[in-house]
Design a protein with these regions (language model features):
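C-terminal motif of bacterial Sec signal peptides marking the signal peptidase cleavage site
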Residues: 16-19
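Charge-biased low-complexity segments
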Residues: 21-252
């Protein structure tokens, strides 16, 4: 059963979350409830806004089920009701809704979610959240040659080659600094692991994982990295960050 959360619009964000809904829970501490709502909104907005995608515009209703560890077990996106679609800016043209819902569902599975207050959960430990999303990612901002799009494409490249097939047992962020020559051969790599701001409780420093990621990074051919470029000295340097969690295992 989905509970009702008050609408909220981020007018300055590329993606705005109109609100979330879940089951009524009058016994829940109001401050804890509001913190969860705010963190849930922040997580979804960040995830959608940083997707490596072309132009995407529209209003989508996303249904998410989280288990007792705040891992997603269900992600379903559909066209939002008319009352949400009518609030999109008048000067934008919605893009293909099927492509948009596929993107939202894919990002839903990649998102790191906040801890759900115990009193909000169902008897089986889960919680269902319904989130109307306004998505405005214009073509100019999403062009492949923009700095932000290159950054997201590079993040996904390193995810595919370093972390995707790793069955991690904790939640965190991995930062990566690299240096390569003009041919893309890696000459230096530094991977660091640290807590995700929404799930500091679930982070464990894993020296073996850190060493493995460093080793994998050193073996990469970065000539295939999106946006790969060298400076006047023939060196390529860069930085990226990746979120990781058990439910992201073997997901794109």
């Amino acid at each position: 059963m989905f509970k009702s959360l008050s609408p909220l619009v981020f007018a300055t964000a590329l993606i705005t979350l109109a609100g979330c809904q879940s089951k009524p829970a009058p016994e829940v501490d109001e401050q804890a409830r509001q913190t969860f709502i705010s963190d849930m909104q922040r997580a979804l907005i960040h995830s959608m806004a940083t997707a490596d995608t072309g132009e995407q515009i529209g209003a989508v209703l996303l249904e998410v089920t989280l288990d007792g560890q705040s891992a997603p077990t269900h992600c379903k996106a559909v066209r939002a009701p008319v009352k949400y679609r009518m609030t999109l800016p008048a000067d934008v043209m919605p893009t293909d809704i099927n492509a948009l819902t596929r993107l939202v569902e894919a990002q839903c599975w990649k998102t790191i979610y906040p801890v759900v207050p115990a009193a909000v959960r169902e008897e089986n430990g889960t919680v269902d959240v319904r989130a109307p999303l306004y998505i405005v990612l214009p073509g100019a901002a999403q062009a492949p040659d923009t700095l932000r799009r290159k950054a997201y494409a590079q993040r996904d490249f390193f995810w595919q080659h370093l972390l995707r097939d790793q069955p991690v047992t904790s939640i965190g962020k991995a930062s990566l600094y690299y240096q390569a020559n003009a041919q893309g051969k890696v000459e230096g790599c530094l991977v660091q692991l640290y807590p995700h701001p929404l799930r500091t409780d679930a982070f464990r420093l894993d020296g073996n994982l850190q060493a493995l990621l460093n080793s994998r990074c050193m073996a990469l051919d970065l000539s295939k990295l999106p946006g790969f470029a060298v400076d006047a000295q023939g060196q390529a340097t860069g930085y990226t960050e990746m979120d990781y969690a058990p439910w992201r295992f073997n997901r794109p």
